[in-house]
Design a protein with these regions (language model features):
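Long, solvent-exposed N-terminal ectodomains/accessory regions
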Residues: 1-188, 192
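Surface-exposed flexible segments
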Residues: 49-52, 60-68, 102-148, 234-258, ...
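Non-catalytic propeptide/linker segments at domain boundaries
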Residues: 191-314
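Core alpha/beta catalytic barrel or barrel-like domain that forms the active/cofactor pocket
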Residues: 347-357, 385-393
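Acidic-and-aromatic substrate-binding clefts and catalytic sites of carbohydrate-active enzymes
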Residues: 10-15, 19-46, 51-64, 76-92, ...
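Catalytic grooves of carbohydrate-active enzymes
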Residues: 212-230, 292-307, 314-316, 326, ...
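Acidic (Asp/Glu)-rich catalytic clusters
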Residues: 309-315, 330-353, 375-381, 464-467
């Protein structure tokens, strides 16, 4: 059952190539070569899994080296390292039909070049890189230098839509936002090129109406069930605006813009005989009785805690980890790696909000059941019994209103009759409920990675004092890049009696004694972003 929802794949080749990147993504230095190489990677990996890129341990997606070792160990792949751009072009020049020149003075031109590269089988280059691609016999496909000088982003993408959109993939689109300006980090471009996606960074901010109308045009043209890959453009709009907009169309988001190697990862299935087995601490039909104490559970979201999994200390405390469930479709080996390397204290949960990152208060009612059925099937494959929900459409980053309307809660309870329960929020939220034996508990606390641990301890002790009714069920969201080691001392200094539990035991106990009030988002609750 473990591979039921993975596209049928032929056996990947056993002799592949690897490259190592550094952390220099500056437009003036490291970006041009990296952009060319990830475009070449997308072409080289279109028919075979030929090229894998390893990033440094302090890159945001820190698992590229462990996953590289996993491919060698579990799939029997032997890699030859390519150390130079020249050598990469020599090896893979047959995968490319030519090159597209982007204008380093006009940032959006890189996205246009990526779009053309996917459609025309090209690599993207700046003016300085033209000699090296010509040396390897590549011919010019298009030259964007000067084409978009002085134009607004809306003008640039309006032109690109007219020229290229009709030829692009309608099941997938690349929102290549994220870092902008002096630093750009398009590590996911290989995937967009392989899949012939349209690349853009159009704003979802109503204040930029000329861009928003184009953004909506693209979303409206996508097929039902489509996915947006990438991430919103920093400094132009907010994550809340972008995700709310996608959710209004019933479209899933899979990020980030710098998630590497999908063109390679998508070609591997789970290893023969592999089946997900989660670290359940309690049977689904078990009945537990809460005592007069404080129960705490820690949850890491953000795609299995971006940047945390390989750090020391994991396993010392019970932790739940939100899994990007759609990786069963385009990165199965990564999910198998996480499950293989999990400790008994690591517990996997579904999310975020469904079969992709979405804001459920805004999902169209006719799409909600279909999307949640997809999520339910993925959770079955992944042996997950808890769904994590997040809706920040009315919030301001990690603060503000992250609550769910009652009709949204109703829809979740109807869609997931067999889960142990639900966790809600990102920052603290107030939505809580209990129906039959399935609680919905919102986070009471959010641990910012930069907050000193003694202040985190003081905050949690204050919550324990303020919430004097026992048992008190304290769900804590541990933001990405917070390592487990840093929380061990926090737990040791909490004022008891306190027990840190795995999430499934926590929810079972929360079902036994409802000391929390049922609450949903109200129409007159304050909102930061009023919507569209």
């Amino acid at each position: 059952m473990g591979s039921a929802f993975v596209f049928a794949k032929k056996e990947p080749i056993k002799n592949a190539y690897s490259m190592r990147f550094d952390l220099d993504w500056e437009v003036a230095s490291g970006l041009p070569e990296k952009a060319m190489l990830v475009s070449l990677q997308g072409l080289a990996n279109r028919e075979e899994a030929q090229l894998y890129i390893i990033h440094p341990p302090d890159f945001q997606w820190e698992i590229t080296e462990p996953l590289f070792d996993f491919y060698k160990r579990k799939h029997g792949v032997s890699y030859t390292e390519i150390k130079t751009v020249d050598a990469a072009l020599e090896r893979f020049k047959s995968s490319a039909k030519g090159y597209v020149v982007w204008d380093a003075e006009v940032g959006p031109s890189l996205n246009i070049a990526f779009t053309i590269a996917g459609l025309e089988d090209g690599v993207v280059v700046t003016e300085a890189l033209i000699p090296i691609v010509q040396k390897h016999g590549l011919k010019p496909i298009d030259d964007l230098r000067g084409r978009y000088t002085g134009q607004s982003h809306a003008e640039i993408y309006s032109d690109a839509i007219k020229r290229y959109w009709h030829r692009c993939n309608r099941d997938k689109i690349m929102l290549m936002g994220g870092h902008r300006g002096r630093v750009m980090m398009p590590a996911m471009a290989d995937w967009g090129i392989r899949e012939r996606m349209f690349f853009h960074e159009l704003s979802a901010d109503p204040e930029e109406a000329d861009e928003l109308v184009l953004n909506r045009q693209l979303l409206e043209d996508l097929n039902v069930g489509a996915t947006v890959f990438g991430w919103h453009p920093y400094g132009k709009d907010t994550e809340e605006q972008s995700t709310m907009l996608l959710s209004m169309y019933g479209i899933k988001m899979e990020g980030l813009h710098n998630l590497p190697n999908l063109s390679y990862n998508c070609q591997f299935d789970f290893t023969p005989g592999f089946r997900f087995t989660n670290n359940h601490q309690v049977a689904k039909d078990a009945v537990l009785i809460a005592e007069e104490k404080v129960y705490i559970t820690f949850v890491q979201s953000d795609s299995v805690g971006i940047g945390v999994w390989t750090k020391p200390g994991r396993g010392k405390l019970p932790f739940a980890w939100q899994v990007t469930m759609n990786w069963t479709k385009f990165s199965p080996a990564a999910l198998e790696y996480f499950h293989e390397s999990a400790t008994p204290n690591d517990y996997f949960i579904g999310g975020l909000s469904g079969p992709g990152y979405m804001y459920p208060n805004n999902i169209p009612k006719d799409r909600f059941p279909v999307l949640m059925e997809e999520a339910k099937q993925l959770m079955t494959v992944l042996d997950e019994h808890v769904m994590e929900i997040m809706d920040n459409s009315a919030a301001d980053g990690n603060v503000g209103n992250a609550d769910l309307f009652e009709e949204t809660v109703d829809a979740y309870y109807e869609a997931f009759p067999d889960v142990l329960g639900f966790i809600n929020g990102y920052g603290p939220a107030r939505t809580r409920d209990l129906r039959d034996s399935r609680p919905m508990i919102s986070y009471d606390y959010y641990i910012d990675p930069k907050r000193p641990r003694d202040e985190v301890t003081a905050d949690l002790n204050e919550l324990i004092t303020l919430n004097s009714k026992r048992p008190y069920f304290l769900a804590v969201h541990v933001r990405e890049s917070n390592d487990v080691n840093s929380l061990v001392t926090v737990v040791e200094n909490l004022e008891g009696p306190v027990e840190v539990l795995a999430l499934d035991r926590f929810l079972k106990l929360a079902a036994s004694n409802k000391t929390y009030e049922t609450r949903f988002r109200k129409e007159d609750d304050p909102v930061h972003f009023k919507g569209y």
